[in-house]
Swiss-Prot record:
Lineage: Bacteria, Bacillati, Actinomycetota, Actinomycetes, Frankiales
Source organism of the structure: Parafrankia sp. (strain EAN1pec)
GO CC annotation, single: DNA-directed RNA polymerase complex
InterPro entries: DNA-dir_RNA_pol_omega, Pol_omega/Rpo6/RPB6, RPB6/omega-like_sf
Gene from which this protein is expressed: rpoZ
Function of the molecule: Promotes RNA polymerase assembly. Latches the N- and C-terminal regions of the beta' subunit thereby facilitating its interaction with the beta and alpha subunits.
Protein name per the record: DNA-directed RNA polymerase subunit omega
UniProt family annotation: Belongs to the RNA polymerase subunit omega family.
C-alpha cells in the first residue's frame, strides 16, 4: 500500500514541547488555548448572522471540520497571538 500518511492534527501537531515554549506553564497554555478556541467558536457562530465581533482563524484551516482548539494551538505555535501574564494576586476576600 503506497501513498502518503495523513498528518495528525490537534495536540500531536504542533508538538506539546513547542507549545510550552510560548507560555509559563502547561496550565497557562490550557487557559490561553481555551480562550482563543472559544473566540474562534463564537466567530463561526456569528458568521451566519453577519455579526463579526470576534477575529476568525489567523492560520489557514485545513478543513471545515477542524476543531477550534486545534486552530488555536496552531496559532499559538506560529507566534500569531500574544498574551499578558497577570502578576498581581487578587485581594483577599473578607
Amino acid at each position: 500500500m503506497s501513498g502518503t500518511v495523513a498528518q495528525p492534527e490537534g495536540i500531536t501537531n504542533p508538538p506539546i514541547d513547542e507549545l510550552l515554549e510560548a507560555t509559563d506553564s502547561k496550565y497557562s497554555l490550557v487557559i490561553y488555548a481555551a480562550k482563543r478556541a472559544r473566540q474562534i467558536n463564537a466567530y463561526y457562530s456569528q458568521l451566519g448572522e453577519g455579526l463579526l465581533e470576534y477575529v476568525g482563524p489567523l492560520v489557514e484551516t485545513t478543513s471545515a471540520q477542524e476543531k477550534p482548539l486545534s486552530i488555536a494551538l496552531r496559532e499559538i505555535n506560529s507566534g500569531l497571538l500574544t498574551h499578558e501574564t497577570i502578576t498581581d494576586p487578587l485581594p483577599p476576600i473578607s
